[in-house]
Structure formats: C-alpha cells, structure tokens
Amino acid sequence: MNDFDRTSYLDYASAMRHPNNFSNTTATFFTQDADINIVHPFNNASGAQAYFKTVIEPLQTSFEGMYRRNDISMTGKFEGHNWVSSTGYYVGHFARDWIGIKATQQLCYLRFGEFHRMENGKAVESYIFFDIPELMIACGQWPIDIGPGLARGHTGMIHGPASHDGIIQITPDPSEGQKSLQIITDMLGSLATKDEAWRPFWHDNMMWYGPGAFGSFVGIDHFASFQIPFESQFDGWSGGSKSNGLTKHFVRYGEGNYACSGGWPSVTGVNVKSFLGQPPTNEQVFFRVCDWWRREGNQLVENWVFVDVLHALLQLGYDPLPPTT
C-alpha cells in the first residue's frame, strides 16, 4: 500500500473533523471524474463537484455545525489496486429537512462507511454508505417496526472498536493483515450452511453492529437469531466472496487485526419469505453491503455492517422514504 494514499486520506478525514464548507476538501481528495457510488436515494455522482453538490452541501445545510468523526480507518490492496476505507459518523444539529426526513431541531448522528480506490493520492472510484434508516429510527420516522430476525436488535448510536485502535496510521506487520483477511474470507464462505459452519470463526460474546433496520446484537446465539432467519428469507442466499456469477466484492483486504469488504451488490437470493414486512416477490434481490471486522487472536470479536436497505426495499416495490417537496 502506498503510504502517500494513507496520508492523503487521513488528511481528508482530519479536515472534516471541524465544521467548514468542505468544498475544497472534497475537490482536493476526489478526482474531477471520480466514479462515486452512493446508497439510495443518491446512487451515483460523477466527480468531486457533483458529489459535493448532491450529497455533502445539502447535508451541511440540514445539519448545522456538521463535522465528521472516524472510528476505523485502514488501507490495503485488492486485485492490484490501492484502497482506503473508514467508518464513523457525521454529526450535527438537525435543523432543516433532509431527503424527506423531518428536522428534529436536535443533535443527530448519521453513520457512514466508505471505500476509495486511490491513484496518486486521489480517489478515482468510491463506494459510500449511509445508514439512513438508523437516522430515521432516531428521529422517530422509520415506518417499519420489525427486523429480519426473530426480533429487531438494539438500535442507536454504534460505538467504535472496544480496543480504541481503529485509526491505523502506521503500516502494521503485513502478516497480521493477511491473517485477518484469511479469517474473514473463510468465515464468509461458511455463511448459509446447514451446520452453521461460520460459528467457530467468532468469539462467543461477539458484537455485531448491524444496520439500523436490522439492529445490533451481542453474543453468537443472539446474532444467530438474526442471521439464520435472514438467510431463510432468500432462497440461494449467497455472498460476494463466492463465485456465484451474480455478486462480487469490489474490495476485500486486511490490515493489522482489522479486515473489511464491500460489494455492489454483495449478497443476493430469491425472496421467498416476508422481509421487513414486505410480502415475498419470488424474484432475485440484490443487496449492497459492506463490513469492517476486528479480531483478537484467531476469532472475530466485532463487526460493523452496512446494508443499503432502501435500495433492497425498492426492489420489493416499497419506498420507506417520505416524499420530498
């Protein structure tokens, strides 16, 4: 990994730690023709200026005093390309409506996760996730009161790593990153198996920080109470680490005791049971997903997950976003 790319990204993150207009910050980090993929309702922006005008500037207008805090930041290589990634929160006073969500006139948090393919210190290809349902739940405006599991998990602000070492600034031993990558690759390949072959990869008291619409869970059995019903709602459930011809990870790498991955889409299956209150369509559904993991020794202890739930629900014929004026 080019340390120049790491420094460039850390500078970008640092510039967003305090309120400013962020236009210069955005223009400096992204190329003018960067391919920027964003969760629904944005979906795509071409270049730094379009991303600023479409996403960042309206968010700043709605969230007074907006700034950004990172909880994890890591770099790595995938298929010969340099990547940087991070997850954390945008923070501000929710003063004006945003994408149809009514302002609360209170402090609000918008969780983000992002990946950038880098060339010469600039982002040329990006995938940016926002947990919009989590914000809507916090504002009392999410219209669905169930999750995909036996019960929706905890909803609320998600913490960074319990070890408080998620911002990696100095390249660690490459063998540790390779170990992290191998563990998550093997674990992902064990999902959706009848014998729950994924269990040995996890600590018994693991933390699964899920998207707001799903909720978060502590302990492997409580996680299973979500994961197994979720898998059963989609026949042929399969993820981006497998060569299924339908989904593919755009990135997957490890650094130190952390690993990350993302797919656009990453998971797919035929919807055969009710999902988030919507009747089955018996059609293929595709999920945009990304993850960060932290391991201790040979087991995964924490997992931060994003799913573009709005995009998934649209495929089922339901739009939970309020109409905009």
Task: Mark where each language-model region is.
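C-terminal and inter-domain tail/linker signature
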Residues: 1-325
